[in-house]
Amino acid sequence: MITQERLLKVLRAPHISEKATMAAEKANTIVFKVAKDATKKEIKAAVEQLFEVEVKSVNTLITKGKTKRQGLRQGRRSDVKKAYVTLKEGQDLDFVGGAE
């Protein structure tokens, strides 16, 4: 069993972008930035326990950090792991709910 402390460290933040918003509307999929060492089972357990929803599937990917320059100095942004979490039919999770 995964500890409560580990579940809180797995999910970093929701990833809000145009592509993520379209995925949420069309496929009932939520995108999260997650810890680099997180597994799909840990991500599924964390979402189900923290948000009280049922997860259908989890797809993960690692986006490589971009190379950036400032004058003569060159640096690199960190790599980020993202998880596309598809919820079961009838489940809903809204991060960007509009004010009424």
From Swiss-Prot:
Record carries keyword rRNA-binding: yes
UniProt name for this protein: Large ribosomal subunit protein uL23
TM spans (from-to): none
One term of GO molecular function: rRNA binding
Assembly information from the UniProt record: Part of the 50S ribosomal subunit. Contacts protein L29, and trigger factor when it is bound to the ribosome.
Gene source species: Vibrio vulnificus (strain YJ016)
Classification via Pfam families: Ribosomal_L23 (PF00276)
Record GO cellular component, one term: ribosome
InterPro entries documented for this protein: Nucleotide-bd_a/b_plait_sf (IPR012677), Ribosomal_uL23-like (IPR013025), Ribosomal_uL23/eL15/eS24_sf (IPR012678), Ribosomal_uL23_CS (IPR001014)
Similarity comment: Belongs to the universal ribosomal protein uL23 family.
UniProt keywords, alphabetically: Ribonucleoprotein, Ribosomal protein, RNA-binding, rRNA-binding
Gene: rplW
Domain of life: Bacteria
Keyword Transmembrane: no
